[in-house]
């Protein structure tokens, strides 16, 4: 269970009450279907059936999608050594070659994910991968499964034309809020994860609105202190991608020009993500001695800090204190030292702890963060479910492509 382990700032009952009311409003509004996911039997039934079918047929699965159609699933895949999932998400000339490297395409399925069914990067990636299969003399269409909202979209029509099965996505669950839907759960099932545990974790998060409201007060207080960079520092090596997923969720939901009434939007922070000791050797210097415009949120896992066999002996004098201890202990020590050093230098911090980021832990963390971001959007008067700033670039890219 996720909890606040260490906070330098007290929360008043008045502030918490306002956040509780805002969180209740946004979750009860029905504007987004993400809070409903744990109780939607169809989502879990389809995820299990489709994921199991793909698992029986194929040894590997390539997921084509970008942004919310990919990042959350990548988080899940990163927690299983030897994952059989590959991801085609970015547009570059060598992406397909990298993704298929070492794969036997004859036993590799393809899951194409686009909520709108018109994301040009996803459609282009599908074309590029199709041509790769065709050059290898391997049938492509019969190895595909499509996830999309509308069968009348470009992707939906293409799938119908080639008799490719389609799983329809709920129209009220946006991409960045969709990881616990079929978008993330079908690949998770393929990779052997326990879907029921994800579901339990999400249910646990929904039963703890008071905890989410307390988190909301912490972040709102950081905005009031003019801390406009929120740095999520994950101290679990398996959570490298989780920071990128959270970065998208936060930025697209809270970075708005206008509020719901069409007035200039209140400012929300820019998210950044860091990983354990790696970023103690990259961005820590700037955080400690740079401007006091950052709120550092440590996310620590008890399981990560107990992993590894004890070091029986060392051949380095500097490592003698580690003898008899695991690498997890070293990770824990560095995390605590980092917390203490930032506090001593006057940097605002918050530490969140969870026992283990397994299926249940991931389900809880992901639902908690989605509730947090939606609640912050509501209390700031923003729409946390749209992304109007992204649309202009899409339109310009299509115009430029026609002229290229």
Which role fits each region the language model picked out?
Residues 14, 136-137, 255-256:
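Non-transmembrane, aqueous-exposed alpha-helical and coiled segments at domain scale
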Residues 39-55, 212-223:
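A short, well-structured juxtamembrane/interface segment
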Residues 40, 86-89, 115, 119, ...:
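Hydrophobic alpha-helical scaffolding
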Residues 33-36, 75, 193-197, 207-341:
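Acidic catalytic cores of enzymes that act on phosphate-bearing nucleotides/polynucleotides
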């Amino acid at each position: 269970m996720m909890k606040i382990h260490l906070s330098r700032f007290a929360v008043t009952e008045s502030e918490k009450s306002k956040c509780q009311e805002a969180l209740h409003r946004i979750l009860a509004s029905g504007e987004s279907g993400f809070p409903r996911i744990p109780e939607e039997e169809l989502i879990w039934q389809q995820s299990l059936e489709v994921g199991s079918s793909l698992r029986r047929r194929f040894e590997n699965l390539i997921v084509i999608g970008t942004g919310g159609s990919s990042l959350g699933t990548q988080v899940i895949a990163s927690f299983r050594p030897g994952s059989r999932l590959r991801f085609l998400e970015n547009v570059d000339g060598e992406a397909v070659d990298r993704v298929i490297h070492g794969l036997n395409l004859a036993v590799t399925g393809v899951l194409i994910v686009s909520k709108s069914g018109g994301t040009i990067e996803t459609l282009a990636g599908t074309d590029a991968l199709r041509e790769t299969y065709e050059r290898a003399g391997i049938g492509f269409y019969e190895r595909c499964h499509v996830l999309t909202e509308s069968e009348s979209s470009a992707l939906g029509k293409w799938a119908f034309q080639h008799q490719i099965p389609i799983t329809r996505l709920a129209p009220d669950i946006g991409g960045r809020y969709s990881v616990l839907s079929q978008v993330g759960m079908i690949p998770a099932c393929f990779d052997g994860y326990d879907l029921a545990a994800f579901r339990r974790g999400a249910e646990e998060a929904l039963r703890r609105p008071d905890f989410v409201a307390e988190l909301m007060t912490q972040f709102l207080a950081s905005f009031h202190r003019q801390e406009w960079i929120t740095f999520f520092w994950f101290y679990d090596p398996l959570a490298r991608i989780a920071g990128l997923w959270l970065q998208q969720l936060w930025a697209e939901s809270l970075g708005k020009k206008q509020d719901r009434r069409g007035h200039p939007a209140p400012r929300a922070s820019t998210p950044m993500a860091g990983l354990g000791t790696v970023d103690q050797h990259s961005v820590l210097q700037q955080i400690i001695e740079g401007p006091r415009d950052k709120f550092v949120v440590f996310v620590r896992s008890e399981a990560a800090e107990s992993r590894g066999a004890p070091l029986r002996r060392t051949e380095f004098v500097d490592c003698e204190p580690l003898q008899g201890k695991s690498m997890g202990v070293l990770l824990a020590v560095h995390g605590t030292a980092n917390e203490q050093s930032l506090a001593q230098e006057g940097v605002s911090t918050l530490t969140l702890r969870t026992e283990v980021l397994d299926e249940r832990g991931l389900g809880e963390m992901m639902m908690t963060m989605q509730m947090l971001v939606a609640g912050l959007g509501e209390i700031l008067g923003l729409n946390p479910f749209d992304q109007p700033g992204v649309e202009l670039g899409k339109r310009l890219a299509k115009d430029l492509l026609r002229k290229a």
